[in-house]
From Swiss-Prot:
Manganese or magnesium. Binds 1 divalent metal ion per monomer in the absence of substrate. May bind a second metal ion after substrate binding. The gene is rnhB. Its EC number is 3.1.26.4. It comes from Corynebacterium glutamicum (strain R). A divalent metal cation binds at D13, E14, D107. The keyword Phosphoprotein does not apply. Endonuclease that specifically degrades the RNA of RNA-DNA hybrids. This is Ribonuclease HII. Its cofactor is Mn(2+); Mg(2+). GO terms for molecular function: manganese ion binding; RNA binding; RNA-DNA hybrid ribonuclease activity. Residues 7-198 form the RNase H type-2 domain. It catalyses: Endonucleolytic cleavage to 5'-phosphomonoester. The keyword Cytoplasm applies. GO terms for biological process: DNA replication, removal of RNA primer; mismatch repair. PROSITE patterns: RNASE_H_2.
Amino acid sequence: MSRNGLGPVAGVDEAGRGACCGPISIAACILPDKPIQELAALTDSKNLSASTREKLMPLIKKHALAWSVIVISAQDIDRFGIQHANISGMRRAVAALDTQPGYVLTDAMKVPGFTVPYLPIIGGDASARCIAAASVLAKQTRDDIMTDMANDYPHYGLEIHKGYSTKIHMDAVRHHGASPEHRYSYANVAKAHQEWLHAADNDTTEGGA
């Protein structure tokens, strides 16, 4: 695309859309056109081990012509909705690039409001290097946030499942209630938190009987 006068090309991707706790992170990245040996392992971040992502993240930042990461809190997700958070985050991530792109590639996501042409590519994080780089930046940033968050909220195992809806996670919400970092607009969180409230009310009633 750069050779066709549409460059530089930015890739955009998100991490955490399907989680029920913690933020969503959205990254944008512009890579040089030439192959980069240190980034040969780049592919969809979901197909990379945690250790590989950790190694790639500083290398992506080192070689990228420009990169940015936007983090949108669980509170804003509850307030505006995940779709709005995702789309606005992608626009903000592209706008935050030091070098403005002439074209944007997304991982199958339609994003109205870009100031330049864009193309959603199905499976783009596995086929376009700039999207793959963005996916690593987004996921590793979010994983680091969730690992730190586990220190503040140790009951949920956030360092393990990173806020996704595993059985262990939902059982913990039923037992301890949801934390301030949970997405209360998500039905599974609301239901589990309500079950905790109901159990707490029953315990109070029985204790006062």
